[in-house]
Amino acid sequence: MKLFVYHTPELTPTDDLPDCAVVIDVLRATTTIATALNAGAEAVQAFSSLEQLMEVSETWLPEKRLRAGERGGAKVKECDLGNSPLDCTPTVVEGKRLFISTTNGTRALQRVEHSQIVIAAALINRQTVVNYLLSEHPSTVWLLGSGWQGGYSLEDAVCAGAIADLLLQHLEGVEIGNDEVIAALALYRQWQTNLLDMFYKSSHGQRLLGLNCHEDLKYCSQTDVLEVLPIQKEPGVLIKY
């Protein structure tokens, strides 16, 4: 298995795709996707465009759909939900399809949607993601951070490091594909016992604190608390594996 880390979709090779793409947006898209599927959502369908989200979701019965939209960390007023995983309770999402568009995470999913395997990872489901990689053993794996508007994101990098660290503990012969893997490992090993404090210091963490999303940060900083693997069944549509 050859492992690569890319901090944003824009930094990936333009002429290549991995056997398995692991998309990361800890604050908050992939955390929300994992939480929604764990709570019984039928599927999560991701869109980079809010207009496309509205158009496609309009073909679904209102009682079978939820629209989740976020721009700049804040809820889009035309949508039912924003991008908070804490809103995705069984009472709200069970049996429904979540149509979601966010500032960063949905763009990352779109970049790799034609990969053979696409899964969504966050700290909360890190162990389940690693278990899948150990079971399926794809030849090339991209850990793809979503970043923030094309720039580096501390929380996505530390999650990539957390996945790589656990994978290396359980699998011999993992080939390190780029220097970003080494940097992500070092970042995680420095902060692994104090991830929430790191989130408070990060630029997007500061942005969310300004929107009074303290509880979201606490939830998103937890490691290995959900046994759920969001996996793409068709481009842009993720289901529980």
Swiss-Prot record:
Record has Protein transport as a keyword: no
Task: Tell me yes or no: is Hydrolase among this UniProt entry's keywords.
Answer: yes
Which keywords, in A-to-Z order, does the entry hold?
Hydrolase, Magnesium
EC number in record? 3.1.3.71
- What family is this? Belongs to the ComB family.
Superkingdom of origin organism: Bacteria
Cofactors that this protein relies on:
Mg(2+)
InterPro entries attached to this UniProt entry:
ComB-like (IPR005238), ComB-like_sf (IPR036702)
Q: Which reaction does it catalyse?
A: (2R)-O-phospho-3-sulfolactate + H2O = (2R)-3-sulfolactate + phosphate
Quote one Gene Ontology molecular function term.
magnesium ion binding
Q: What is this protein called?
A: Probable 2-phosphosulfolactate phosphatase
Gene3D superfamilies linked to this entry? ComB-like
Write down the Pfam families for this protein, in alphabetical order.
2-ph_phosp (PF04029)
Q: What HAMAP family does this protein map onto? A: ComB (MF_00490)
